[in-house]
Amino acid sequence: MNEIACYQQLIEQHLYGKLGAVKLLRYIELKSGHSDNGHAWIGCVTPSKTGRTLYFNGRGLMKRKGQRRGESGGNYVDMESGESYWVSGVKKNGQDRHWAGSGKVLVESAALSEYLKVIGAKTLDGTRCEVTSTIRQTDIERLSRLANSSGKGWPVDPEKARNPYSFQRNVSRAKE
């Protein structure tokens, strides 16, 4: 059974959230201001019940509505900062970064064994990737409340919005 069918079956059987958090292996790349050279990770994301929000590295990434890519080329947007991200499944050939991009992809240490299985390798290619243990915990409860609060996030009626493909930022990110 493929990943999507398995996920849909959990939702239909009302088991989502009762069996522990669903984790999906994904490639995540920051697009805002970086084109194809932004920071990039391979790690486990936790999807919301609808699958429209992914939680990873302290962020809530909401799927863009309408056209798949915004001005920056991303298909997800950080609900707090408004930064654009590209999120996709990992490629079996291990060449996840765009051909025009550069920089190493950080592989989450907790996802390393699963990633190596997917690409059919025994070791990581050190010229393209490196292992990291700096992935932050994500406060899913807080971000979920933020995403579901009224009047925030995506416009209720995209047809009436000035730009139906733009995301309305919810809050300002706290200075760390």
Question: How would you describe each model-predicted region?
Answer:
Residues 2-44, 53, 59-176:
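Mixed-charge, low-complexity intrinsically disordered regions
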